[in-house]
């Protein structure tokens, strides 16, 4: 109830919460929604249509044009059931792995401190606020390795990461990171062994770009 006093609109996608793609949820404050017009037109969003005018509905159906993604909605419901079953375990597990990964990256930096053959600049929230994602820049012999190159080497080892601006180029400009960062995200299916695999791949980045 308290959140309703502060949020005009909120949305999320289920594909990042164990659900299917193509389905999400949008919360709108009632007064806020009445001042909005639909961006997608289709069946079910109108009250009346005249020859030269249209009258839209005033309820939430205004933003649900056409046939809904029925299978996606059913899948989203099952995702909610799964999240309720595991409760907070997924978040705590991901947070724990992020903490371990950050510490191991710091240890890696320390081991190469003298010759700087490999240096990792870490961008991550405090562990207490971290949800399992760690971003970083990679430097070999003092020169930055482009995040896309890092991701490519990781991919050869069957490690999937995100690389680039992460839909936040203005933030990257503010942080003076023109090439973006490599982002590692941990989830319920990851273990500490996966962290060790990432570290081994970083060693490969050093070997390839240190020649």
Each PLM stretch: what is its role?
Residues 1-211:
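Pyridoxal 5′-phosphate
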């Amino acid at each position: 109830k308290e959140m309703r006093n502060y949020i005009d609109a909120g949305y999320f996608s289920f594909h990042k919460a164990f659900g299917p793609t193509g389905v999400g949820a949008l919360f709108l404050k009632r007064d806020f929604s009445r001042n909005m017009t639909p961006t997608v037109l289709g069946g079910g969003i109108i009250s009346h249509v005249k020859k030269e005018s249209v009258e839209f509905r005033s309820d939430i159906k205004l933003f649900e044009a056409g046939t809904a993604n029925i299978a996606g909605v059913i899948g989203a419901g099952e995702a909610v059931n799964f999240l309720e079953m595991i409760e907070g375990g997924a978040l705590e597990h991901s947070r724990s792995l992020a903490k371990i990964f950050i510490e191991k990256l710091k240890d890696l930096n320390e081991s190469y401190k003298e010759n700087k053959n490999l240096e990792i600049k870490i961008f991550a929230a405090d562990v207490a606020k971290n949800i399992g994602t760690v971003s970083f820049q990679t430097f070999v012999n003092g020169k930055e390795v482009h995040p896309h190159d890092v991701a490519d080497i990781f991919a050869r080892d069957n490690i999937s990461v995100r690389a680039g601006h992460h839909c936040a180029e203005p933030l990257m400009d503010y942080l003076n990171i023109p090439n973006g960062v490599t982002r590692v995200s941990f989830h319920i299916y990851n273990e500490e062994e996966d962290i060790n695999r990432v570290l081994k791949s970083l060693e490969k980045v050093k070997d390839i770009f240190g020649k």
